Amino acid sequence: MIFEAHDYIPISSEAQRNIANLEQAYSAWLDTARSMHELPASMYWAQKNGADYLVAKLSAKDNGTAQGPRNAQTEQQHAQYLDEKQRLQARIAQQENILTERVALYKTRLFRLPQMIDLIGTILRQLDIEELLGIDVMVVGTNAFSAYELACGVRFPTGNEATEDFDLTWCRKTKAALTFNAGLTTRQQRKSLFAVLREIDPSYKINRSKPYQAINDKQYEVELLAAPSVHPLPKAEAFAPMYSLFEQESLLLGRPVSCVLATVSGKACPLVVPDPRFMALHKLWLSRKPERKSSKKDKDQRQGYVLLDAVRHFLSSSHPLNMDFVLDLPEDLRLIFDVWCKERHFVPVS
């Protein structure tokens, strides 16, 4: 199964400009959304023992914390809070209007660009606001392939079939996470993945028979995978991924890819996914895994070949298949890569 450059459908230059404009608009919106998130949910005066006290609620569910009795300092604190909140609300409203316009252009039927289902988009936006996306977790599985298409500037002939499965892999304090650390506040007390899911939908619960999986009342599943090297996870994390997923290790290597695409209903959706070279070889490895369900093996193989060939044709500058890459490969993946090279008469350059 060999894919040549002409087997892929080019994304037009106009569509690529719209993709870049959407990413720019989303980045501006995200900065404001994070600033809004840092503010208390509300700040108000409450009476206690006949005196006014300033109370701040960090979230809607918070009982509130007294900031002190009414005086010049707390009145100034309250006024500054109201001014900042009003300023950010005005800015984010303007940015959301721009985002709506950019998403509409992205979704132009002529371009036929990949789209994400709405629930996944909601989860990923919130993970991005909370500074978990790309820092603690990356998207893996079929949902990652939309990012690879945008990175390559083409639509794949196969491999990006619609799916409602949602898999994440843990990447905190790994080489992959370093790519996205720059410029973040990296709050000392960030929420856990499970806490973010519960904030979106309180019906999410950890599946007792599969503790690496959270499931809501509508039976939508979110799974967290983790390589042995990242265990144990933080105590605050309710997920309990299996310790034996050695194949996840390779997804923490190389240079991850990030992008922004549209959801079906017209929202922006960020994606951070593993290095496409390692994801492709990971998929080919899965297609050879004896315990793997036979129904999944064919899809794994198609995805692995179409992605690695796409890297060969379109990502030689950013993700070269050179000797440096070969030397970074674990032995089991190097054997698969050697076979792939022989089939294509491909010789990695120094």
What are these regions (language model features)?
Residues M1-Y53, K61, A66-S350:
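Compositionally biased terminal segments of proteins
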